[in-house]
């Protein structure tokens, strides 16, 4: 039941995310922002709220059973709202982090508001995501078909007052205020817009299932993590940006010379130019360009233009601008994690997307004398002058980052290219290391070892896999052994003799374990097979061998037919069978390996509900069954579909759309959700033990602790051991699972373990 709560909504003004250009006499977006992007969306709410120009235009709020009230600067304080908070009452907002930031950094110091207790806040946006609805209020209102909706004209009114304007000859003002003469009607429209947002937020909240106590507990911890933020190396970011700007200018000049004046960013014109040179592309996004560059017999000039587009359009190096623009005054990035951003409950990232950072830089060698990295084409180490040693192993290591940043500090593109070759690749390799511990602090990080593989093995009861994890065997090697028939002892002997893994580990075991666990076929294998040495028939053989070795996992995916379509029989089993039964028979629960499937009429509407071992629920709205149209469908086979919000054009139409699913994908959702529940439990345990999390990335947790000298003589760091022990402590529903954290490290800069 929804507890009584107040609802509030701020509308604000600020020049944050704008910069004045004297040459054009206009406001522009910050450096590196996408064309046309300015303001709050570029700098993020934490930096926005702290900007000296940020102020309140209006606050609308409603206490339970009361009409909507308004407060604006210059009016008497909203003491009834203060009294509600003082009595322990809860206040809800849509994206409550923004309201909390404005309250804390504008209203408390400037207007004497009391502190806002975080534990008394609720967020209807987070609740929407937990319920698998879209987060944006306008979209949420449309999906829920609310009788009161977000005012479509409000954006015009907000833009009139909330951001600076470009002066004209007839009107030299750079700001328009609601209190300016002649603004009465539009000002009232803005205040009414804020009132309506409060009403829409309340209506949406009434239609959604509230967060469970368990969900709310972790949401509050996520709020803590976002409020705390993570430190960044701001000077090094600016050094990298200086080199990046030079590289972009250089590549831009080359592109103009090759194309007759076109910039790499002019997508439509560049597509036309490429078409004229025999290269037809519907998109110039990174995936499309990468695919095109694999083609043979391409016009050399067109290939070079595509290479330039790939370099300049790299999303990884553009993270630098986001880090610079979103940094707070204490050189920390905040509010980077979106709670329950994915259907499974896993987070998604904001701004520089810390959940998706590049892992590697250029392939360098380390000087045996001074230990510093350089291009393997040099005859001598450019750092110390010692002659190069043939046969040194090429690659990228986290230890290289400080040395690369040392050269970046010269801000010389030529010098960076001399030492490391591709400057943009060198920058990309450093981005992870630009996230740092704060002054006087260290980072400690560790990640789970193959946690999804452990989860699916335990769910399915695949005993040889469970035994392998309990014996701490390498699952990639164990899987390769099952597929190829080569004994595990042979692989281990190879490793002892050669000092490196057998090639089958990467060529066979890795793509099998990463690509096949959720029903993947040839394309799924190839995503993870960097060697690309097998034909489709060979890959198909590997997949069949993997499946033959993992019958319990295949059973877990489930299906609707036993045997071949021409001589089998209908039977619903596993996750797919349970989902179909639940949809077909509302009100009944169907259990598979402790996972419950049922169809119920939830506050937001009819939905398929999957209840995990933890008790957390996954929601699939308006789930339906239809006759399957896939090739080789078994007699009477049904397909499952549900309604969801799609914001990625790669997956089809945008908006509230119907998507299909099947046993393998349901297994993927369930396994990822359970793995995330384990990570949540660990974060709560670390918090209780005094290890505050600054970042969590799927299977990894990063905490920040006071610095201390390195342990002497290779003695293990007790704090790393403690972090990993807490991470390996399982909740009651996963007792005895062979989950372990490994590869822990301690240091000043973030790196891949």
Language model features with spans:
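Conserved catalytic alpha/beta cores of large enzymes that bind or transform nucleotide phosphates
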Residues: 396-451, 470-484, 489-510, 514
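Conserved RNase H-like, two-metal-ion catalytic cores of nucleic-acid enzymes
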Residues: 1-135, 329, 345, 360-362, ...
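Conserved "right-hand" nucleotidyltransferase catalytic core of DNA-directed polymerases
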Residues: 1-41, 51-60, 143-149, 157-427, ...
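Active-site palm subdomain of RNA-directed nucleic acid polymerases
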Residues: 208-218, 678-701
